[in-house]
Amino acid sequence: MRDYIINDKRWEWDVIEPGTKGDELTLEITSETVATYASDARNFNPRYIDASEGEFAMPTTIFREGPLRRHSMAQSAGYTALEVVEENSRQTPFAKCTARWFKPIKVGDTITSCAHVLEKYDKRGSKFVTFRVELTNQDQDKVAEYDYTCIFEYAKGQNLS
């Protein structure tokens, strides 16, 4: 985690800018990665455990093959994510996630994902940030995307217990 701490500038809601991008991540989809994910998800369907070239991966593999990587977005903006700052670190709790699939991910694909800040907003005094992760294959076809929303600040006076 120390690699993510680039300075003491905290990536708080007021400095987050929509459009901020993180780094790209490219991964090969192999029979082994499909089987490992299926096993980890406790889905022992032979379709995934014994997948061969050209066969489909589980749809939810998008969350492993295209992880959120908020830390890289914070770093690209010159800040440190709140979860890893040295003093007074804190979580930004999950609020919701919406995923959309456009094409299947298959054994033999090369998947590249990139995340960016989609929007930030205030709702009833609480402050939210939505991130979008987009996944494309080796043909530059978008295979999936998901929006992941976190609560950066709770409304003042809200009882959190």
Task: Annotate the PLM regions.
Residues 1-96, 157-161:
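Hot-dog-fold acyl-thioester-processing enzymes
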Residues 1-17, 96, 101-161:
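HotDog/MaoC-like acyl-thioester-processing domains
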